[in-house]
Amino acid sequence: MDINTLIQTLQSAVPQIAGSCCIVNGALMNLTEVQNMGYDGFSMRAKMNMPLKLYKYFPNRPTELIDKQTGKPIKDEITGNTKTINYSIQALRDNTVFMQSPSLFDDVYDSDIGLNYLEYEKARLLEYCIRCEIDVKETMETPELANALMQTIADMINSTGNIDFLFKNTTVTKNEDLSNQCFLLELKNQLYKGKDLGESLRNVIVSDFNRYLQYLQDSFRATCFATTPYSQLMWGGSYADCHRGFCVEYTVLPNDPQYRKLFLNLFPMIYCKVRPNMTEKLVKFQDKEPTMELLWDIYFHGVLRKSIDWAFQNEWRLLLPMERNRTEKDYCVSFFPFTKVFLGNRMSHTARKEVIDICHEKSIPYVGVTRNPDVFEMQECTIKCEDCPYHTNNIPK
């Protein structure tokens, strides 16, 4: 059963079946079974079935350079023109891939872990009440928890004039101590702005929520790969700029120590129809040291999970833990060696020549991609690009 048939089967299935299945590396699997594999089990299965060829599509177009401080394009001092850089050509010259923040991908759900704010608010208020040694129960509703915490805060302000010693219990972890300090600083800041206690507390919880969600999304950076160089949807979209870009073939080397870290951090995407609510499970990890259980939850419910609508990509991802606010250069990572470059069907003569020159320089085989005349498929062109009258004269083929 090919990938398109799998997608149609899952999309047309009754809700009970569709909600329990997923597509992983072109195979239909039970979603619960995949989840129960855990990090180690899923990783081992992925490595057993990993394709030895991976493909990355590049748009091959210039990008304006933006000043991070002003947010404005950087101008050339002499010409006054906006400075640009072609990251696709840079990646081809350097044999690197760019580790992107998933929040910038084209899928609005990408790496978005399902945290419900209302449930988070209640759980967080309960946690802060416990740290203040307030007599509360898990069965209490959000307004009750908020009122109990506000009463304790108000009593401390009235008796001592500050809230520096609001938290009574001994903190267990450094992260918990930091979260307590953040709470106090944010609450003081809100009160100094003239907010009433209720609004101040609400804003603190909102800040907590946004900060934690950002942490979950930014724990890793990713770069994406396909398993075929002939996908019309990949060529025709922004990935290859409507056939004007190129596609690079990489050969995976599982046993080469030089690429061991890359190999171990490559995973197939999990395509399904359902998004679970992870609030209760993830809130308990918020101020704890990261564990393999948390890592798997971020992977399974976040960076490796996408809608079934994207299953045609049959995507593999390289995931690496990387801090935010590093330079662009730091996010460029050396990858497996090139073994072929596929040139887009609509590449201009100038763009094609530039890529071919780099291929000659690095001794990389290259081939043009053309339309199959009999079926709607892309295929290798049998004519060498330099000898092809269509491309030397910019005639569509």
Question: Model-derived features: where do they sit?
Answer:
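Partner-binding and oligomerization surfaces adjacent to conserved cores of proteins
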Residues: 2-397
